[in-house]
Amino acid sequence: MNTAISFIKKNTVMVIALLAAVITSFIVPPDEKYLHYFDYKTLSCLFSVLAVVCALKNVQFFYILACNIVKKFCNIRLCTVVLVWVTFIGSMLIANDMALLTFLPLGYYVLHTAGKERYMAFTFIMQNIAANLGGMLTPFGNPQNLYLYSKFNIPIGEFTLKMLPPFLLAVALITVCCVIFVKPEPIELKDKPEKIDRKRTAAYLFLFAIAIIIVFNFIPYWIGMIFITLTLVVMDRKALAAVDYPLLLTFVFFFIFAGNMARIDVIKDFFSSVLQINTLLFSVISCQFISNVPSAILLSQFTSDYHSLLLGVNIGGVGTLIASLASLITLRQYNTLNPGKTGRYIASFSAFNFSFLIVLTAFCMLLV
């Protein structure tokens, strides 16, 4: 009994996702269409990056890199800004979920190395917002952008120009938050970094490059995943054992929930009518309940106003924990590193995210 309770506490979000999937499965009984719910590429990329990040942790890569960042910058405020900006840039290049999987461990090691763990929740929240909003600028910055870019055949120049104003506002807001909420306290290393295993680190960085190449479709995702898995079986089986499999299952259950929601006639009819009133506003609201990727797929069937829809499903990625499934990655990482503090984190997460959501929604309403 105690073991079950402990498991539920540790994997609360996964259990909620499972319940949501099971409940909606009574409304939409399982059939062959369920197989189309899953974004197999996303799941493969998540597994690949999680596995490689675990391997890099095992050779102290992030710890040594964090030590170098601490030595480079004179105070914790600058370190925080750098971490958030790196996540911003990373989300534009390798997508929001991959950026978080890569740079959240770096954020942890920077703060831990500097002895500034009290800024952990704030830094993770800002990195999360940066990942969700930084990806809006490019078609491959997040899954919903890639889907809408392909469905509506949006010219790349038009796409970038449409998303540039809210992107610049997001950059400004996050930078201001870092300046206000993080004091310019001097920092120094608590421990002397160990020497890095160059050969193993080089091999794991090569595997990380393979994981990123999968995102850009240079090789089929299943080939990349198999190659990474087999390599780690030989080089570091502990990395495969350390993969956060409950996080992967959380995504699976949410895919089922969102897919079922999109097939319920009452919900489909509702969205069809409200989108005629205000596509931007209702796409933002939709994201808060069924996440931004399912919202983009569902709502694109009922509107041709791709500009408003594009804005809505991007800024709608902030707000609730399920507004963007990438936020579940951050929650899971924080809960693992800071057990027992999840409630406080969710409260801070909600306060910052809804503040950003209100400001960005009001701004985008002026653009459309």
Stretches found by the model and what they are:
Residues 2-33, 45-60, 181-183, 210-238, ...:
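Structural signal for alpha-helical transmembrane segments and their membrane-water exit/capping regions
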Residues 85, 89-133, 147, 297-311, ...:
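Hydrophobic transmembrane alpha-helices that form the pore/transport pathway of multi-pass ion
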Residues 40-42, 71-84, 113-123, 198-203, ...:
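Membrane-interfacial loop-to-helix junctions in multi-pass transporters
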Residues 67, 180-205, 237-241:
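Flexible interhelical linker loops that connect adjacent transmembrane helices
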